[in-house]
From Swiss-Prot:
GO molecular function annotation: ATP binding; CTP synthase activity; glutaminase activity; identical protein binding; metal ion binding
Record bears the keyword Glycoprotein: no
EC top class, as a word: ligase
Residues that, per the record, bind ATP: 16-21, 73
Source species of the chain: Porphyromonas gingivalis (strain ATCC BAA-308 / W83)
Ligand binding (Mg(2+)): 73, 143
Subunit (UniProt): Homotetramer.
Record EC number: 6.3.4.2
Protein name from the UniProt record: CTP synthase
InterPro entries for this protein: Class_I_gatase-like, CTP_synthase, CTP_synthase_N, GATASE, GATase1_CTP_Synthase, P-loop_NTPase
Known catalytic reactions: UTP + L-glutamine + ATP + H2O = CTP + L-glutamate + ADP + phosphate + 2 H(+); L-glutamine + H2O = L-glutamate + NH4(+); UTP + NH4(+) + ATP = CTP + ADP + phosphate + 2 H(+)
Length: 539
C-alpha cells in the first residue's frame, strides 16, 4: 500500500471508557484482513513515562521489548495483535516537551520564540508519523489519552486537527463516547455524546466514526438521532455494548462492519472478511469451559483492578487454553498472617506472588510462600516474588534468620538479594532500572526448561536488585536450584525447588510476553500443575 493511513481514537464524556480496547480491536480486524498495523498511545501527563507512577495512580506499568516503561494500554495492543511494541508506541507530554526543550538548547529553532503552536504540535506530529515513515505499516492507529475538554489534551487535539487537514483521506478520527442509561426514566440519554462531539468540533475536528459505549443495546432510532445531531453518517455510528470479556469487542465491532467503514473512508477496497478463526476458537474455549482452576494472586495492590493487569490476563489466557475457567482470588499481602494463612490459601490450586517494590506487604508474601512450600502448593514468583522465594528459603531452610533484600534492610549479615553492581552509581529514579528483554539460559532437565520446551528464552525485566551469587552454592546444596541465568553476566534469573510439585520463581516478567494467540509457556505450565494439584486433592 502506497500511503500509510492514520486513525486517531479520542474519547469523550468520561475517562476509562476503553479507548485502548477499541483501538486494539480495530487494529486486530485490520490485521486480520492482511494489513500491517501499528498502535500507539499519547498520554497527556507531564511525566516522561509512567515508570515512577504509583499503581494506585496509573495502574500497571508495562515494559516494552526495547526497555521502555509504558502505559498499560500497550499490553492490550500486544495481546490483541501479537506484535511487540517499542518506545515509539507510547509518547507523553513530558517526552514531547523534553524533546522540544532539548532542540531549543541546541539552537535548532534558530532564535525563534518556542511556542505550543507550531513547535509542540510539530513535535507531536513528528512522533505520530514516526511509525508510518518506517514504511512497514499500512495503518497507524493512535489513541489520544484523556477526555476531550481536558486542558492537557489540547495540544494533541490541535495536532490531530492539523494532520486531518494535511493527510486528507489518509486520516480519520474515531470518537468514543458514553451513552448513559437513566434507570429512573427507563431510557438512554444521548445528550452527553452530542456535547462531547460539539467540544471536538470546537477544536476543529469532525469525527468520522462514533463508537457509543453503553450498558444496553441501542435502538436504530437512537443511532439515527446521534448521527443526525453529530453530523456523522448513520453507518458510521457503532455501538459497543458491555460484554463479558474484552476479547469479544473485535467481534462486536466486526458485526457492525466498522472495519469495512474504515476501509471505505480511507479509499481502500473492502476485500474478503477478516480471518479470525483462532480468535473465535479462543472465545469458544472460554465459553465452553466448565471446570474451574482457582489461583491466588498475592500482592499489595490487589484492590486496584489494573495494578497487575498483564498477570491477570496471562493467567486467564493460560486457563482457557487448558480448557478451564479462571477463578482469580486477590489476596492482599499486608493482611496475610501466620494465624490466617492456612484459611486464606487452603482452597487454592496454586498461588502467584506478585512483583512490586518496597517493604510494604513483603512479610505477608513470605508467610504465604512458607505455607505454599510446606504444603506443596504450586507457586510462581515473579520479580520481587522470586526474590521473596529466595528470602523465605534462606530463613526457613538454610537457617539465615536475618536474610533479606537490601532494598528493605541493608544492616544485615545475609544479603541474599542485593543491589546490582551497575545500579550502585545510579542516582535518577526514572528509566534507570534493568529494563527490557534479556536472554536467559535454562538448566537442562529443570521444570522451567520443560515449561518452555527449550534451553534459551528471552524475557523482559524491570528491577534493580538481584540474587546474590555468593549464596548460590549454599542454596543449591539446600535444595533450591538456580535454573536460569543470563549467559553474558551470570545473573541468576530463575530458581526452583525440585522437591516440590511446582515452586518456581523468575526475575523476569513473563506476563509481558503472553498474548491471545500465543500464551506464555510459563503460565501454561503453571496452570497445568495447578489443575493436577486440584485433581490429586479431589482423589
Amino acid at each position: 500500500m502506497a500511503d500509510t493511513k492514520y486513525i486517531f481514537v479520542t474519547g469523550g464524556v468520561v475517562s476509562s471508557l476503553g479507548k485502548g480496547i477499541v483501538a486494539a480491536s480495530l487494529g486486530k480486524l485490520l490485521q486480520a484482513r492482511g494489513f500491517n498495523v501499528a498502535l500507539q498511545k499519547f498520554d497527556p501527563y507531564i511525566n516522561i513515562d509512567p515508570g515512577t507512577l504509583n499503581p494506585y495512580e496509573h495502574g500497571e506499568c508495562y515494559v516494552t521489548e526495547d526497555g521502555h516503561e509504558a502505559d498499560l494500554d500497550l499490553g492490550h495492543y500486544e495481546r490483541f495483535l501479537n506484535t511487540p511494541t517499542t518506545r515509539a508506541n507510547n509518547i507523553t507530554t513530558g517526552r514531547i516537551y523534553q524533546n522540544v526543550i532539548r532542540k531549543e538548547r541546541k539552537g535548532e529553532y534558530l532564535g525563534k520564540t518556542v511556542q505550543v503552536v507550531p513547535h509542540i504540535t510539530d513535535e507531536i506530529k513528528r512522533n505520530v508519523k514516526l511509525l508510518g515513515q518506517k514504511s512497514q505499516y499500512d495503518f497507524v492507529i493512535t489513541e489520544i489519552g484523556g477526555t476531550v475538554g481536558d486542558i492537557e489534551s489540547l495540544p494533541f487535539l490541535e495536532s490531530v486537527r492539523q494532520l486531518k487537514w494535511e493527510l486528507g483521506q489518509n486520516c480519520l478520527c474515531v470518537h468514543l463516547t458514553y451513552v448513559p442509561y437513566i434507570a429512573a426514566a427507563g431510557e438512554v440519554k444521548t445528550k452527553p455524546t452530542q456535547h462531547s462531539v460539539k467540544q471536538l468540533q470546537e477544536v476543529g475536528i469532525q469525527p468520522d466514526i462514533l463508537v457509543l459505549r453503553t450498558e444496553h443495546e441501542l435502538q436504530p432510532d437512537i443511532l439515527k438521532k446521534v448521527a443526525l445531531f453529530c453530523n456523522v453518517a448513520p453507518d458510521s455510528v457503532v455501538q459497543s455494548v458491555d460484554v463479558p470479556t474484552i476479547y469479544e469487542v473485535p467481534l462486536v465491532l466486526q458485526q457492525q462492519h466498522m472495519d469495512e467503514t474504515v476501509l471505505r473512508k480511507v479509499g481502500l477496497q473492502v476485500g474478503p472478511v477478516p480471518e479470525m478463526r483462532q480468535w473465535h476458537e479462543f472465545l469458544e474455549m472460554k465459553h465452553t469451559a466448565r471446570e474451574t482452576v482457582t489461583i491466588a494472586l498475592v500482592g499489595k495492590y490487589v484492590e486496584l483492578q489494573d495494578a497487575y493487569k498483564s498477570i491477570d490476563e496471562s493467567l486467564m489466557q493460560a486457563a482457557i487454553y487448558n480448557r478451564k475457567k479462571l477463578n482469580l482470588i486477590s489476596v492482599h499481602s499486608e493482611k496475610v498472617t501466620e494465624a490466617n494463612v492456612a484459611e486464606t490459601l487452603k482452597d487454592m490450586d496454586g498461588i502467584v506472588i506478585a512483583p512490586g517494590f518496597g517493604s510494604r506487604g513483603v512479610e505477608g508474601k513470605l508467610i504465604a510462600l512458607k505455607y505454599a512450600r510446606e504444603n506443596d502448593l504450586p507457586t510462581l514468583g515473579i520479580c520481587l516474588g522470586m526474590q521473596c522465594m529466595v528470602i523465605e528459603y534462606a530463613r526457613n531452610v538454610l537457617g539465615f534468620k536475618d536474610a533479606n533484600t537490601t532494598e528493605i534492610e541493608s544492616n544485615i549479615e545475609h544479603k541474599v538479594i542485593d543491589l546490582m553492581d551497575e545500579q550502585k552509581t545510579v542516582t535518577d529514579m526514572g528509566g534507570s532500572m534493568r529494563l527490557g528483554a534479556y536472554d536467559c539460559a535454562l538448566r537442562k532437565g529443570s521444570k522451567l526448561a520443560a515449561a518452555y520446551g527449550k534451553e534459551f528464552v528471552r524475557e523482559r525485566h524491570r528491577h534493580r536488585f538481584e540474587f546474590n551469587s555468593q549464596y548460590r552454592e549454599a542454596f543449591e546444596k539446600a535444595g533450591m536450584q538456580c535454573v536460569g541465568e543470563n549467559p553474558e553476566t551470570g545473573l541468576v534469573e530463575a530458581v526452583e525447588v525440585p522437591a516440590c510439585r511446582w515452586f518456581v520463581g523468575v526475575q523476569f516478567h513473563p506476563e509481558y510476553n503472553s498474548t491471545v494467540v500465543n500464551p506464555n509457556p510459563l503460565f501454561m505450565a503453571f496452570i497445568r500443575e495447578a489443575i493436577k494439584t486440584r485433581k490429586k486433592d479431589k482423589e
